Amino acid sequence: MEIYGMVTGKAGKSGYGSASTAEDVTHSIDAKHLTAIITGGTSGIGLEAARVLGMRGAHVIIASRNTKAANDSKEMILQMYPNARIDCLQLDLSSIKSVRSFIHQFLALNVPLNILINNAGVMFCPFQLSEDGIESQFATNHIGHFLLTNLLLDKMKSSARESGIEGRIVNLSSIAHTYTYTEGIMFDYINDPDRYSEKKAYGQSKLANLLHSNALSRKLQEEGVNITINSVHPGLITTNLFRHSGLGMAVLKAMSFFLWKNIPQGAATTCYVALHPDLKDVTGKYFADCNVTTPSNFAIDTTLADKLWDFSIKLVESLP
């Protein structure tokens, strides 16, 4: 991701750039044959992605901890597009129990699943353990989505097989994945308050999203499954994620105002990777400004990715 492109909005090889919006990158795409789950689809990038996918005809399931906010989002989209197909299901990604409950609710709908957008997240939170005893940013941003994705894979595989339509998983990562702990993932001390850094813990969780994508991409390719998984950096956007940030972030934003995007621009890369036909068979990549870019060395470390995969499997299997 080049600074020049970020500032000027100049399009990259894909034909899109930092100034492109979610509507721009999905122009003329007909998604009526697709069903998508979007986690955290009640505000910011998630809501914009839900709106645009709904506008393009996809059946959108908004998965959110706050059911009122989800229903309000649904009503807003329906007011704009009365024929949109929007459903809402409750999902708290910080809770293993809630993730498993969501799976039961979704499977009961008896619909296919073509697109999974793992968008929800928390950022820069004070140290706190989830109800399962996992540091909250790691629990919500990685473990919850890791389990959700694994439990939805059979449905995605059968949908891809029966329809012939490529399934797509989009993990919302961040350039913040480059700012993590010295060892990348602090496996032995994830729940240690004495070693906790709000910003590094966030970076660790975003690195985990990338490692998860890359490990699962390799596994799906080995199986010969018609499903891709990619990671995206949305850009610098002011959303509800910043509710835990302080004065320092306000100063940073004031000094770098020319790099920040609005929400329609911030949702562009997510929607591009989820829907654009040019990305057929593209998997295991990291996108920013709707173009493939290079992540950190940690992010492409297959040994680290496999270690995180095994760690995550053991962790979720140890919980009821």
Swiss-Prot record:
Its EC number is 1.1.1.-. It holds the Pfam family adh_short. Its main location: plastid. Expressed in the dehiscence zone of developing pods. The keyword Transport applies. Residues 301-317 are annotated as: Interaction with calmodulin. One of its GO terms (biological process) is protein transport. The active site is at Y196 (proton acceptor). The keyword Signal does not apply. Keywords: Calmodulin-binding, Chloroplast, Membrane, NADP, Oxidoreductase, Plastid, Plastid inner membrane, Protein transport, Transport. Part of the Tic complex. Involved in protein precursor import into chloroplasts. Maybe involved in pod abscission or dehiscence (pod shatter). This is Short-chain dehydrogenase TIC 32 A, chloroplastic. The lineage of its organism: Eukaryota, Viridiplantae, Streptophyta, Embryophyta, Tracheophyta.
